[in-house]
Amino acid sequence: MGSEMCIRDRYKIFTTEFDEVAKAESLDTAEEIQKLRKNLDQQLTSFQDLITKLANKLQRQLMAKQNRSWEFDLEEGLLDSSKLPRIIIDPYNSLSFKKEKDLDFKDTIVTLLIDNSGSMRGRPITIAAICADILSRTLERCSVKVEILGFTTKNWKGGKSRQEWNRLGKTKNPGRLNDLRHIIYKGADSHWRQSKKNLGLMLKEGLLKENIDGEAITWAFNRLKKRKEERKILMVISDGAPVDDSTLSVNSGDFLEKNLKKIVKFIENKSEVEILAIGIGHDVSRYYKKAIKISDVQELGDVMIDQLSGLFENKKLH
């Protein structure tokens, strides 16, 4: 899993040999994925009113911005009837025209990166999956591309990376010591209808393990960087600090945290990608300049929609 953004400066990785980037559909049988999606759909029914409300709210706001986006006092374009009274008062005033602006938000991609760690099990991951579902459906209707990614590890207790480390004599401070699993639930160019079944996989028993956030953000960032869209937004949904027991047991206690801070700082200060985070039950503002904490996972949908509609005011995050 080569990384275009340099993350190796003082951040060691023992081995990348056992890491994987997996399409969600490759992680279980088609039958099981269908079953998990049905399970998600059953949970969706209790949120149906909320979903419809949120989806309509975001769509209304996007479409309103689309309709409101005009340039005034132009030499040519559509006649601006609101300025006609001044010509009646003084015929020497020239006619004023208006023109609709290009719709900036259409040239936008949003990547949703979801923490697939064990502490998200149960209600948090269900709500995250539901929100990802709502978001991709709604933004797709408004011609905004959406990518949905997840991150975890393949194993507890370090997996094959740790076995290899043991075999080679347990070198001191080996760096990250577990097998990464990065999951593509929905690629930016695939339609929601094609990918919706994959979102149920987040509910799969045994999928959610450790979370190594810095490398996951690097991966999502590098995918975004390759996109042709002018505006790129990375939204991280997480429930706190990066944790991997295998790595932290043989490195400094802040090893993963330091890397996360460094990666986020780089993206915030030195890249065109706009990054924001939603912390579920935890304040993540110590890692991200633009961060929101929600206490109850039920708030997630509302917060996501509010944040996104704020972003589409055609203002960059600062």
Predicted stretch roles:
Residues 1-4, 8-318:
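Acidic, glycine-rich A-domain
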